[in-house]
A protein has these predicted regions:
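Conserved phosphate-binding catalytic cores of ATP/NTP-utilizing and phosphoryl-transfer enzymes
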Residues: 1-2, 110-134, 315-316
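N-terminal beta-alpha supersecondary unit
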Residues: 4-83, 112, 116
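Short beta-strand scaffold segments in enzyme catalytic cores
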Residues: 16-21, 136, 144-148
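Short Gly/Thr/Asp-enriched flexible loops that form oxyanion-binding sites at enzyme active sites
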Residues: 79-103, 122-123, 280-289
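Conserved phosphate-binding/catalytic loops in two-lobed NTP-binding clefts
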Residues: 109-110, 270, 287-312
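Glycine-rich phosphate-binding/hydrolytic loop that grips phosphoryl groups
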Residues: 116, 300-338
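Glycine-rich phosphate-binding loop plus the immediately following alpha-helix
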Residues: 150-193, 217-226
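A contiguous, well-structured pocket-lining segment that forms one wall/lid of small-molecule binding clefts
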Residues: 189-270, 279-293, 320-323
Length: 338
């Protein structure tokens, strides 16, 4: 019996992506990132859904072509049902349902956040994946959480942000600095030439493992406004130091809670996932903890950090193996709990 070939489709925000997987190995992973939102300083939902409609067919076609797969060879179709922007999700969901119906193959819904975590089980991403149980710090523009992963689909959120996500904080602070959207990668790059101890910003004090990032943003805003009154060129003259200091503050905040969870639970299998897991400072601090605290760490390949269909296909394969299929009458949902 031939190994199943799964097509994965991702459209939760502003990335239209399709991927093909077989035996946990990615045969193709194509993405079209929408740049139209840059001028607006954030994702515009209506524009995003329209762009998905234009992009989804060519992206899927390119994914199949790169994998050297014909449509009739597809065993099942996995798609992001949520969470995310409803209009964007509906495009991917409708396309996946239509294609599954026309090919008479199973449809498999995928939770976008679970997919970020389970991307660690893609073979080419990590030939030696995490052992259960493990902790995963999942950080993106829309979510920040610490997840206790007991099994593939046995996950518990033990800590999460009560306001802004870490990626959202990077973007909002980037706007204060006059940087383009999305600002996370720009701040990371500028921080390479800056002093992370140049400026000190307020850090939230919360019990347990929960996060808060809105206070950091406010602290930066008030500090910059005060300095600009003294020197109108303050941001331009200190941009690298500002970026390095902000990055250190956010990463320290992320790691403090993760370190607490590791200590309290006694679990030293530790992973990171999501778009912010591409941040160089976060990766460096994770590596430092591996060396000093004896953590066994798992850091995703860069192509699996941002929204991508490879992780959707990975989860779909796991569900296919378990015989967990989705009714064709299903629809997308902007909120989708584990």
């Amino acid at each position: 019996m031939n190994a199943p070939i799964i097509l994965g489709i991702e459209s939760s925000c502003d990335d239209t992506s399709a991927a093909v997987i077989r035996e946990r190995k990615i045969l193709s992973n194509i993405a079209n990132t929408q740049t139209i939102h840059n001028e607006y300083g954030g994702v515009v939902p209506e524009l995003a859904s329209r762009a998905h409609q234009q992009n989804i067919i060519p992206v899927v076609q390119k994914s199949l072509a790169e994998a050297k797969i014909q449509q009739n060879e597809i065993s099942a179709i996995g798609f992001t049902r949520g969470p995310g922007l409803l209009g964007s999700l509906l495009v991917g969901t409708s396309f996946a349902k239509s294609l599954a119906m026309s090919l008479d193959v199973p449809l498999i819904e995928v939770n976008h956040l679970q997919a970020h975590i389970l991307a660690h089980f893609i073979y080419d991403a990590n030939p030696t994946p995490p052992q259960f149980p493990f902790l995963c710090l999942t950080v993106s523009g829309g979510h920040t959480m610490i997840v206790l992963v007991r099994d593939y689909f046995d996950m518990e959120i033990i800590g999460k942000t009560i306001d802004d996500a870490a990626g959202e904080a990077f973007d909002k602070i980037g706007k204060i600095f006059g940087l383009d959207y999305p600002a996370g990668a720009i701040i990371d790059k500028l921080a390479q030439n800056g002093n992370p101890d140049a400026f000190t910003f307020g850090k939230p004090k919360l019990e347990g493992y929960d996060y808060s990032f809105s206070g950091i943003k406010t602290s930066v805003l008030y500090f910059v406004q005060k300095e600009l009154q003294k020197n109108p060129n303050f941001i331009r003259e200190n941009l690298s130091d500002l970026c390095a200091s902000v990055q250190k503050t956010i990463v320290d905040t992320l790691m403090n809670k993760l370190q607490k969870a590791v200590k309290d639970l006694g679990i030293k299998e530790v992973a990171i996932a999501g778009g912010v897991s591409a941040n160089s400072e976060l990766r460096k601090v994770m590596q430092s903890n591996a060396e000093k605290q004896g953590w066994n760490i798992f850091i995703p390949k860069f192509e699996y950090t941002t929204d991508n269909a490879a992780m959707i296909a990975m989860v779909a394969q796991l569900k296919y193996e378990r015989g967990e299929f989705t009714d064709l009458r299903t629809t997308a949902t902007s909120r989708y709990d584990f």
